[in-house]
Amino acid sequence: MEKTQETVQRILLEPYKYLLQLPGKQVRTKLSQAFNHWLKVPEDKLQIIIEVTEMLHNASLLIDDIEDNSKLRRGFPVAHSIYGIPSVINSANYVYFLGLEKVLTLDHPDAVKLFTRQLLELHQGQGLDIYWRDNYTCPTEEEYKAMVLQKTGGLFGLAVGLMQLFSDYKEDLKPLLNTLGLFFQIRDDYANLHSKEYSENKSFCEDLTEGKFSFPTIHAIWSRPESTQVQNILRQRTENIDIKKYCVHYLEDVGSFEYTRNTLKELEAKAYKQIDARGGNPELVALVKHLSKMFKEENE
């Protein structure tokens, strides 16, 4: 019977394991380790929390790629193009519950409550993002930021929230987490449409093909209400390179990339200020600095 159980587990987890072997940046793990500079969580608890966060993050990527109709993930074929959509959905959902099972081993009365709250946030944010895209409704910048805080903040909040359950450090880290959540997502949006590294790794400007309203496109749409070019391009779900190149050129012309870079610089400065106010954190500063290179080097 044992053997069969092992085989079943292997079959169920194969799409998930496929994703794990793709090269990733491990930003969430680095983030948890950096926050531990303040929180000083016992190593055994920290390892479980890092594992849970990585599991949920990677499982959500499997689902994301289906919802976004993506072709590539980190430069490799998406899991569902190899294993099929049904198996991948099941595998990702299975991993969510394995994550929950792991949270139970932390043996803290508030851990499951926190897990549930943050996963609800994650799905609310993701649901809004999909709703706007599929109903061709462009959110305002404020609406978009609120959604991002649910989506990226969901998993950031989970890792740090679980860590705080096992820490004597009780200062409110939410404002800093919010700044970092916005910084990460807007940086991703910028990279998808503007960075060399990204276009080699993801199919060129994939956010345009997906029809996604991202930070630069939202700026372009609201700053030029008389033009419907961007909406029309997003609506087409185009794979045409020339149309996508034209859209990037248009975003450059109307100042959307510059606006996005300035927003990122403001968020970066705000993060340093919030880190300083909590007594400093060299690891976290180094991580933010490293991630900021991308939108600075390009324009020097």
Curated annotation (Swiss-Prot):
Its EC number is 2.5.1.-, 2.5.1.1, 2.5.1.29, 2.5.1.10. Its cofactor is Mg(2+). Its main location: cytoplasm. GO terms for cellular component: cytoplasm; cytosol; nucleoplasm; perinuclear region of cytoplasm; Z disc. The keyword Coiled coil does not apply. It holds the Pfam family polyprenyl_synt. The modification N-acetylmethionine is found at M1. One of its GO terms (biological process) is geranyl diphosphate biosynthetic process. It comes from the Eukaryota. Mg(2+) 1 binds at D64, D68. Keywords: Acetylation, Congenital muscular dystrophy, Cytoplasm, Deafness, Disease variant, Isoprene biosynthesis, Lipid metabolism, Magnesium, Metal-binding, Transferase. Dimethylallyl diphosphate binds at R73, K151, T152, Q185, K202, K212. Isopentenyl diphosphate binds at K25, R28, H57, R74. Mg(2+) 2 binds at D64, D68. This is Geranylgeranyl pyrophosphate synthase. It comes from Homo sapiens (Human).
